[in-house]
Amino acid sequence: MGLFSLKKQIAEAAAKSAAAAPKSNLPPEKESLYEAMVQTLLKESKTSMGMMGKSSTKAAVQLLYPNEIPKYAILTNVSLGSLAAGDVFTPKGFKNKTNVVLIITDERLLFAGALGTPIEKVIPLEEICVIDDSNITSVIHSVLRVEDAETILAIDGNKQVLGAFCAELKKAVRKRKSRT
């Protein structure tokens, strides 16, 4: 999906959802853009096995967070030793192990795939965490700051790990809400 097509779909979806009430503390115009992006990317994930090209990945980050630098990125099933400068995602995944990167800011959690581009060129990283089935829970509780499970944007990847991650995330969100 090219950058032009992505922007066109986002604009169309944003126009339709502009009247919807915001579900978070984001400004209404940003909330409608976010909701449009969610719907666009979820639709895309069902038609292209969830893998996005570098242009649409950059567009997703820049349109949602034009003034923010993502604080964390989590790469699933990737050893830290493979994250040398210039490492790239390939059509088979990052070093043939994964095609999913979780982009986290203070407000939102995004899932996005990036193909054929050095990851440091797509996402400025302050910290990298690696998750697998054994440490999903500890990563969620120590790193993620997500107030609303509805903010999850899930692009298909490693379904077993991604499914477990989402389940744990929702549990963590419910526990946090019950304490407030």
Specify the residue positions occupied by each region the protein language model found.
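Short acidic DE-rich linear segments
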Residues: 4, 175-180
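A short, sequence-level motif marking secondary-structure junctions
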Residues: 78-79, 126-127, 156-162
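Anionic N-terminal interaction surfaces
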Residues: 2-102
